[in-house]
Amino acid sequence: MMHGDTEGVIPGNALVVDPKKQFRPLSKFGNAFLNRFQCSTVDSPVLKGISIVDSPGILSGEKQRTDRGYEFTGVLEWFAERVDRIILLFDAHKLDISDEFRRSIEALRGHDDKIRIILNKVSHFQFIAV
């Protein structure tokens, strides 16, 4: 999601050929990625200084046996090199360390100072005060 003069959605194939956008190098990940990649534009003053990237969730269990059709960790590395902050959002009930999760963490290595971790749905746990 990024600032734009009008609200809309730009498909990945159009993003990588637009010389005004920074996404040209993502074309190396092929059509399987570009068909899933898109950018929403919103005319909001908040977005004049930031862009927000939301990646698909990490696959776990049987789902991780399904091939995404593109190099997911390569895409993570590409964005990690260019962003100021990486927010990892986890469901506190499903802290599964799958093979894809491990590869994703490896892809983010070297960007530790940018990473913040948020545990979602923590309110469902009862905490004991020590």
Question: How would you name each of these model-derived features?
Answer:
Residues M1-R116, F125-Q126:
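Switch- and interface-adjacent substructures of P-loop NTPase systems
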Residues V122-V130:
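GTPase G-domain guanine-specificity segment
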